Amino acid sequence: MKIIRSIKEMQGFSESARKQGKTIAFVPTMGFLHDGHLHLIRQARTMGDFLIVSIFVNPIQFGPTEDFKQYPRDWDRDAHLCESGGADVIFAPTVEEMYPEGFQTNITVPHVSQNLCGLSRPTHFQGVATVVAKLFNCTKPHVALFGEKDFQQLAVIKRMVLDLNVDIHIIGVPTVREAEGLAMSSRNTYLSTAERRSALSLSKALLKAQELFQSGERNARVLIDTAQAIITIEEGTTIDYIKVCDTETLQDVAIISKPAVMALAVKIGKARLIDNVVLKE
């Protein structure tokens, strides 16, 4: 496995692979890998001749009061997991390499960015779209995989790729969960034992909403109120949002008449956790 930190070297590697007729699969990460990332990496391994995994904690997607400096990092463990998952290359640039002095270009995908996490993190998806566009230009993949746990992020990337005619196939991979249902996240490490118990209410709330939907309930307010009751009864939970939205536009839906996503964000202790479930017949 090769470790590349220079953009020029990364581009050279990918250009050479493409000239040989090889396909490139790409998994972008911020490191501190867990089984959810490993699932993405192993799936990507089957989709290309070469597999590139990026590890880059992107400062421009964090707000001024968010956890950029505290975000967990473990390079040695991440490198081992990438190798065990079959990665050919880890692309791990520095912040200075990605954003040199004078950098000033940003990509905004306004409509799908506005709702959900965009309400409380107004610059987050601008940072996500910008770094992903740069990573695509560095790694030059044919296919890129993203987890569906970050449903809004996936929607933003799909919209950007569509609007800018980026010739990369974007694949969403279902959320990987711990045995008790908690969606895997690097931020789960922030949780104490008691907070982890409270966090299980997120998946329980989504599961109950899904059961109601499958039983015929189409009123989004009923589903939201049900989920809210399950979460608020747990100690230490502060709901940022619970919403039911159109799966493509991410605009709020009152009555569910086509596929929708119930998405939520909840603060528990130091962690802000997100999760979602798609509601479709």
Feature map (PLM): residue ranges:
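Nucleotidyltransferase catalytic core that binds NTPs
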Residues: 2-236, 245-249, 278
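Phosphate/ribose-recognition catalytic cores of enzymes acting on nucleotide-derived substrates
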Residues: 226-281
